[in-house]
Amino acid sequence: DIRLVMNDTKLTPNSGPAGGSRSQVMSGNACRLAAENLLAAMRKADGTYRNYEEMKSEGIETKVKGNWVATYCADHPVDQATSQGEPFSVYMYTLFLPEVAVDTMTGKVKVEKFTVVTDVGTIMNKLVVDGNFYGGLAQGIGLALSEDFEDLSKHTSLLRCGIPYILDVPDDLELHYIETYRPEGPYGAAGCGEAPLDAPHPAILNAIYNATGARITRIPAKPEVVLEALKAL
């Protein structure tokens, strides 16, 4: 049996937060190395593998304790004054193409379709990646058009804060994957958490501009905000 220990710094080193879309790269590489160490111990000279009893009888360790390992220090220069540069070794790249309908009489915006083209490296688990993007698109629609947490005296629940309803999310969501191998990711994978959360909302604002010529510079782009921008044209 394999028992996975998580979030216990008594047994596993603290590797930092799950930020910067680093979880798959960090945890994935750690899991890969652990599995490779285990397989190396199990492998026989003829290419077959020992079972647990055989390993015990031959005095082969059945438990491998990991250690802090640094094979090299990568050169990723960053300008501390401007934060420009390459602070990470693995990145994701995504194009968001929303199609919106704008009611110029009321200012109401409806996202009718969302097409996504993304390169997140080797896809390890497509259902998980799909879930990241579908969830991120729904959040992006809410962030762009309805979610407002500024007035907490008024918005006393998630519902009243403008979380999108299921009818606000289009059925027509297209995800297209390009798999470019990342040498420093586990089996060529990159992260996939930040792209679907960071970029859908500005893409929606750009779609409103493309449809109407009205440039929205603040979110959420509620009907009154869109109507104000339309009247200013």
Feature names for model-found ranges:
Residues P186-L205:
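C-terminal structured "cap/appendage" subdomains that terminate the fold
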Residues L4, F114-V116, L175, A221:
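Hydrophobic/anchoring residues in structured secondary elements
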Residues N7-L137, L143, D148-D168, V225-L233:
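Cofactor-centric catalytic regions
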Residues R3-V5, L167-A189:
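Generic long, charged, amphipathic alpha-helical segments
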